[in-house]
Amino acid sequence: MGMEALRFLHVIFFFVLILHCHCGTSLSGSSDVKLLLGKIKSSLQGNSESLLLSSWNSSVPVCQWRGVKWVFSNGSPLQCSDLSSPQWTNTSLFNDSSLHLLSLQLPSANLTGSLPREIGEFSMLQSVFLNINSLSGSIPLELGYTSSLSDVDLSGNALAGVLPPSIWNLCDKLVSFKIHGNNLSGVLPEPALPNSTCGNLQVLDLGGNKFSGEFPEFITRFKGVKSLDLSSNVFEGLVPEGLGVLELESLNLSHNNFSGMLPDFGESKFGAESFEGNSPSLCGLPLKPCLGSSRLSPGAVAGLVIGLMSGAVVVASLLIGYLQNKKRKSSIESEDDLEEGDEEDEIGEKEGGEGKLVVFQGGENLTLDDVLNATGQVMEKTSYGTVYKAKLSDGGNIALRLLREGTCKDRSSCLPVIRQLGRIRHENLVPLRAFYQGKRGEKLLIYDYLPNISLHDLLHESKPRKPALNWARRHKIALGIARGLAYLHTGQEVPIIHGNIRSKNVLVDDFFFARLTEFGLDKIMVQAVADEIVSQAKSDGYKAPELHKMKKCNPRSDVYAFGILLLEILMGKKPGKSGRNGNEFVDLPSLVKAAVLEETTMEVFDLEAMKGIRSPMEEGLVHALKLAMGCCAPVTTVRPSMEEVVKQLEENRPRNRSALYSPTETRSDAETPF
């Protein structure tokens, strides 16, 4: 090789070396801090400014950036005390490639942007909590390339598109994956490795989306899963037997289109609510028994056929004897007679030329004449009827609810529900005393008349001599409502959903004892009217977010409405549409979230509730606020049951309850001790 050639090679080598050094310098100069500030912040924030993300700037120490945690390559966390050393100034940290993002936690942070593709570039990122925001767009493929990620919560956003298959790349580390309450759709992708078991995965929540297709059977290979939620999607077909093998502690398959026989879950605690809202053909414990089994083995089928053939002779002979005996009967019971018999809790029926009165416990003294001749005074009008205060001939009063024509289901569907409602007796529920149906189909529900004020008027109306509402009194009202709801949900063989919880449907007496009205009425209404009730709940601010899709109330939607009601009690603010033209909407949970972010939580409480309170924390106000926000969680499975709500309210009573026993004290009369 000549000298010129050697010189040429030396020059080439020199330039390659310079280029390599330049590239290395560039890479070392780019850090997770720069990436977060340059790409992630703008993408997540969107068009509206987030108070949390405002701390992400060069003038604020990196360790004080809100919603993030940092760690060095050696595993030691970044502490603010480190900034006392010159080597840990913001300038040096911005360029330090050994500083890594460990956790991104920004729930309820008013994020209106999208998930950036660059999120996959954080090599040591372990947790991403971006739930309860307004993020849109798709889940980037690159999220599945974050090799250290173990906890992901993207619930309660507006993410759309399909779930990228790369998500299952995280299987080795993933412990919890939640995307509940988005607009994701399509068939769930299977892991690339056919035998992938996602051994560490414990929580998988894909509910509240639009996923379709058959049950994703690969999930049955995830042996470590303890909590599985596929609710409120459009899955269909059979639920695989393999699901029964998993050691699940929580399961929700409700509001899909699953059919056939459920697998054997052994001695599980799953109730019917875990499977409600599917195809009527879905059967097996805890639902109705299956008429025939689609899972029988060939041997079992053969045995069943032989048994049926041998039993056919016996059945035929019994049937002949029964028919011969039937002919000898002198009278045949009508369908109505059969429908109205054998009701142990029903006191009796009183029939006349104008219709039929079915009376329940406490309504024994009512007669048809009493009901038809009572003089009425309109108390309230709703989309499905009118409530009257009716004066009886003996001077007593009853409350009559006349159901609007066309609102109620047919008699055969309506009467069993009416009878169930007539059996309910609880001190925090207004009892149904009787039911009247006229010859022309008119229907009346008859209740005790209670000359009490509604909670709505107590909180929001300015009336003379209205009692002061200190915290002790508000707590008693809230606890009474919770107890009534808990009884509806768990105190019956068949749970009752209230379906219309609002402050107008709570009556409060002079001693601040609360009673719920209008429970269970959606069950007797035709679907169009039931939908109207749900729409009104949205207008009034009590509608649970999942009802946008399924429009069928359930215990969890009752819990959500109770959470709004508890916030209304604590804050003294009316939820829902407001203003002269109803063009403003008051979202109570959002007001609380904003106050928490701005560190002004104490300002959300009604001043009247705060009177005399030295420590809202000790008096249970702050705990009640947290409980209310838990009830209002966008993800249904996060919400507590009403039994748990009652327990928490009982355990966190106001310390000074003396003001409960002064019912005559009013806002204008005296200073409340609270």
Swiss-Prot record:
Residue span, Protein kinase domain: 373-674
Any GO CC annotation of this UniProt entry: plasma membrane
Record comment regarding domains: The protein kinase domain is predicted to be catalytically inactive.
PANTHER family: KINASE-LIKE PROTEIN TMKL1-RELATED, LEUCINE-RICH REPEAT RECEPTOR-LIKE PROTEIN KINASE PXC1
Start and stop residues of the LRR repeats: 100-122, 124-146, 148-169, 173-194, 200-222, 224-244, 247-269
Domain of life, per lineage: Eukaryota
Organism: Arabidopsis thaliana
Biased composition (Acidic residues): 333-348
Function: Does not seem to have conserved a kinase activity.
GO terms of molecular function: ATP binding; protein kinase activity
Glycosylation sites: 57, 90, 95, 110, 183, 195, 252, 257
Modified residues (Phosphothreonine): 375
Protein known as: Putative kinase-like protein TMKL1
Residues carrying Phosphoserine: 334, 454
UniProt family annotation: Belongs to the protein kinase superfamily.
Alphabetized UniProt keyword annotations: Glycoprotein, Leucine-rich repeat, Membrane, Phosphoprotein, Receptor, Repeat, Signal, Transmembrane, Transmembrane helix
Membrane-protein topology: Single-pass type I membrane protein
Location(s) in or outside the cell: Membrane
Residue ranges, annotated region (Disordered): 331-350, 649-674
Cytoplasmic-side positions: 324-674
A Pfam family this chain is assigned to: LRR_1
InterPro entries: Kinase-like_dom_sf, Leu-rich_rpt, LRR_dom_sf, LRR_N_plant-typ, PRK1-6/SRF4-like, Prot_kinase_dom, Ser-Thr/Tyr_kinase_cat_dom
Keyword Ribosomal protein found: no
Transmembrane segments: 296-323
All ranges on the Extracellular side of the membrane: 26-295
Signal peptide limits: 1-25
